[in-house]
């Protein structure tokens, strides 16, 4: 038996991680059962830790803090099989980055000279008049003096020459803004949008690049381009700029054999006269190809010290992935539009032959309107946005001859791009690139219904489109790391893609942005300046509970206690805040012994996005049962977390609180365990969160089933309860109803969007209405959570705490179904197929795992590793 798919801290051969303890994981091959393992860790070719032979079937291990900064390390492992025979050694490599104290350079600000910005480029021509109009309206309404427009700025370029000898060379680099770097004209690394998305006034992350092959003996030149990035671009629905400061900066050091040979300092030169004339994450990028080649306008820089914490590269990089060729079409109103066939987050590469000064402008959007014309109106909030909306523009000012432009410092959500140009497009090539964090697709589901298959593909694409360093709600309007979205999607997200590193990074941002009183920022990292209602809405149950739900799910899937330890204080503080809301309940609001465990005060989003209920109605009249339900549910989970961390007293306290919250829920929101409501969500949540007794849950499920049938098999659940709906129905014997909900072709239902040609999951059930008019975002991953039931219910795969159960729920409406899940333990397959009334099952179990299988006819058995037909 041998170990395969070795990972260090959930990463494959990571470079630049922080020093500290390591979480090592692997899978098994060429055997049946692992009975023991042995691990040896080396740092800079010296053995620093040996486990010895450990009698265990676990496929992960924790090490002590074996690696310092700047370490090139490795670990090797061998396994013993069921016959106590050792296998061959397998090896993996890792490398640590710099510690905070290792940085010797200074922060360099390149913008020390006045920048001439004509303002006639596409982005400023769009933003300036809108800004000035809105400011004039603000002043006229007596809401303050009009503020002057700040033009969008060109990228900066910085250079430094240095002499070096050949050797093992590493570049350590980070930026306030985004950077791209070249050594002697060769691009460094394949990460885009580096260093990534952070709460930039509280911390940043740095990358480590192996530049040994790029370094020359003798004279070398390092060139860096610096863009606005998340640091000071427009952001969110309000279009706020300079969120983390109005000054960009870069910090780096290039080392050869562990010694700095080139660091950021005041000997550098900078210019703003390069081809990137404007750049903004949300609004777009303007590129003047006439300025390519030798850069001019070099001037001095300003340096400064900053004690801003800098962490290593503890996640996966953002990369370019799939490429989509553009197909030119003419719309009814005569516009030239590119259709790339897939709604993505990314950008467009342009290649064409043109004359000097000719321009090509692309405006990117998700849909065509009801008349077949290009539109962006579905995702705009032009009234709120300070610059009149999200531009999503790319402009190329051409040089003579062949032109090539691929954006460096922007990303946008789109399927279509409107083309405006005075150049000949006969031989032009437009290619869209999907840009997202480097996550492998780990879940595949196919069945006999093409629309369901498309729904799964759409869900994967919405995850790709919104997991760009941190999870966001949409890649167009808000681009916000909403807690609520992640809370309802994490289980499904971990199945569809290997998103653990992205979720782990996002949780660090959540911790940094938690309020002193324990409430959770709804969005992390911040993407707008807080409004007056922001602190009130940051107390929302279900949203704040992501602080518990997300790390809990990650631990149950991987067994890594570090995710619990890192986030335990955040979990505790949020739960204490939620309990504090309950403690404010007055006798007038609720009587009885458990009134102080009933969450009735404060603002909540409530169920959110229920069909027939507007967002404003939901906010003004949230479902009061939600807070108490989460006080019970999250309390149980937090008790489990405390137990895992060895905090028995905490665990007992949280269990007591959760039990009291259940009693409070029953007293306030049921009549002796009977729910009286016309909304499906109240039944779903009560059953899913075990707020009722078993017989009461059966009765509630029966009522829920009847309500769904009376609603012509349409759901009317909202944001928080929809992920549980089909699972709850199937669990209590109403799988046929769950399937009818799944296959409902009309809105509200999952397949309505598929029928409208969607290639991603929508924000609302009617993102494109019956008249063909698009509304709201057309790339929101949260409703893709239904895929969790396809894997865990339809095909029955559930992997948690290192154990695998399979309990499929076949139905003739699909004819056949097959789910493949590349779990932390290896590939799991569960499938079934009807032949008349006979169902045949096929299963595949990875090495070192068994599966406890339960079939609908009551048969129960355990499967060993291998392929099985039943």
Predicted regions located by residue number:
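Alpha-helix capping and helix-loop boundary segments enriched in small/acidic/polar residues
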Residues: 146-153, 170, 196-200, 210-212, ...
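Extracellular/oxidizing-compartment recognition motifs
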Residues: 1-476, 484-485, 499-504, 521-528, ...
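Active-site acid/base region of carbohydrate-active enzymes
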Residues: 177-178, 260-267, 271-272, 416, ...
